[in-house]
């Protein structure tokens, strides 16, 4: 290989024909039956349960990080995901979309011995996000939208 030539890399990703959950609900909510909504909710819970079985916390679940392909849920954006031991040994910061974030993450406790004790995102944080997503799937509305 010549010194001036550059290697090129390609990233191949699976295609999601219906885009994000947010887009899918905006476009198809009125035609979804309750069985469809329940199916999406079960798929979402199953996908996150699979992660948790391997002690992985997603940490950034929201309607923009859930993709839909042929009416099947695909979790995306694992950039903030952590193994449980990594999450519990590091300080967690809030990166995700606020309405989907575990409210405990905003409760900073100040004590004399520990000036700032940050809440560590965990499996329960993902479960909270799933609850918000399930509400969005069932209602068709953005969370906490006025």
Feature names for model-found ranges:
Residues 91-109:
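Conserved activation segment of eukaryotic-like protein kinases, specifically the C-terminal portion
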Residues 16-26:
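Structural motif in protein kinase domains
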Residues 126:
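Conserved catalytic-loop aspartate of Hanks-type protein kinases
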Residues 52-68:
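Catalytic-loop of the protein kinase fold
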Residues 1-9:
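Short beta-strand micro-motifs within the conserved protein kinase catalytic domain, predominantly
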């Amino acid at each position: 290989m010549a010194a001036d030539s550059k290697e090129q890399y390609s990233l191949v990703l699976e295609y999601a024909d219906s885009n994000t959950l947010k887009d899918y609900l905006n476009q198809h909510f009125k035609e979804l039956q309750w069985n469809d909504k329940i199916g999406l909710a079960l798929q979402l819970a199953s996908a996150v349960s699979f992660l948790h079985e391997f002690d992985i916390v997603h940490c950034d679940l929201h309607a923009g990080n859930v993709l839909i392909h042929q009416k099947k849920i695909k979790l995306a954006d694992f950039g903030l995901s952590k193994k449980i031991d990594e999450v519990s040994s590091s300080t967690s910061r809030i990166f995700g979309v606020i309405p989907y974030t575990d409210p405990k993450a905003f409760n900073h406790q100040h004590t004399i011995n520990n000036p700032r004790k940050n809440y560590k995102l965990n499996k329960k944080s993902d479960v909270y996000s799933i609850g918000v997503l399930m509400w969005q799937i069932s209602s068709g509305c953005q969370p906490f939208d006025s």
